[in-house]
Amino acid sequence: MAKEIVGGFKFDQRHGKERVQVARVWKTKQGWYFIVEWRVGNSLLSDCVNSYVRDDNSDIVATDTMKNTVYAKAKECSEILSVEDFAILLAKHFISFYKQVTAAIVNIVEKPWERVSVDGQPHEHGFKLGSERHTAEAIVQKSGALQLTSGIEGLSLLKTTKSGFEGFIRDKYTALPETHERMLATEVTALWRYSYESLYSIPQKPLYFTDKYLEVKKVLADNFFGPPNVGVYSPSVQNTLYLMAKAALNRFPEIASIQLKMPNIHFLPVNISNKDGPIVKFEADVYLPTDEPHGSIQASLRRLWSKL
């Protein structure tokens, strides 16, 4: 927030445009189409305090102008680029184009359009909607200082065995039985902050951040599931979350910190009886899926040298 002392009070302000929907299509010389669909939010920290305390809008960048800028900059992108690179591009524009703007915050959620295959062949121009969403946030200061965060929303993971929960606190309110055999399901939200601290330090390789996103997603999923034939036992969501986050930091030195949110989405054993006896006897086979209420587990790991 842009901070001022106004009328004897501390005053913080910023303004922007949220939920700007934009899609961009590219066609290669070989005839292949590519598409991205983004939901963009812009927020500017600027010297426009007079618009709040006086009848003076002369320092305001109109939010409608911010919306139009999203489309104009998308039009200028002649080459396919990552969601992170587009966020940085927008933020750089705002801090350089407007002398009043001291910092820009751009956050984007990418809709997961995936190329389809027909008869075993990738389709040149056909796409289907996937599930998890790629997110990015770029905070760029007038000085060129950068904070870049990537993330995943809605990564649904489930394993039907190799999970348990034992040894927890028991008291007069506890009804949950201990178990060493249960289903484990979650919907991962992940945020990781890169260690790049300026616009001049980010990699210039095309689609670098898209590739990194796919690699981080794979590491998180692989450590949730374990090896394909034997899996890995999870004594709690907490332990699994920690091991997933630790694996990401160990694998990617360019990541300074990572935060994971992993709700424990319950699949309840089904036992149904009447006066004549069992109708359904649970034998690790029939469950009642329920997403409310659910356990809420989250944690973050950061490197000791990280200033974040």
UniProtKB/Swiss-Prot annotation:
Catalytic site? K17, T63, H266
Q: In which pathway does it act?
A: Purine metabolism; urate degradation; (S)-allantoin from urate: step 1/3
Q: Does the keyword Oxidoreductase apply?
A: yes
Q: Name one GO biological process term.
A: purine nucleobase catabolic process
**Entry's transmembrane regions:** none
Q: Name one GO cellular component term.
A: peroxisome
Q: Which reaction does it catalyse?
A: urate + O2 + H2O = 5-hydroxyisourate + H2O2
* PROSITE patterns reported in the protein's UniProt record: URICASE
Keywords carried by this UniProt record: Nodulation, Oxidoreductase, Peroxisome, Purine metabolism
Predominantly, its location class is: other
Q: List the lineage, top down.
A: Eukaryota, Viridiplantae, Streptophyta, Embryophyta, Tracheophyta
The protein's job, in short, is: Catalyzes the oxidation of uric acid to 5-hydroxyisourate, which is further processed to form (S)-allantoin.
Q: Where is this motif: Microbody targeting signal?
A: 306-308
Query: What is the protein name stated in its UniProt record?
Result: Uricase-2 isozyme 1
Family from the record: Belongs to the uricase family.
Name the residues that bind urate. T63, D64, F165, R182, V237, Q238, N264
Where is this protein found? Peroxisome
Q: What is its EC number?
A: 1.7.3.3
Q: Which GO terms describe its molecular function?
A: urate oxidase activity
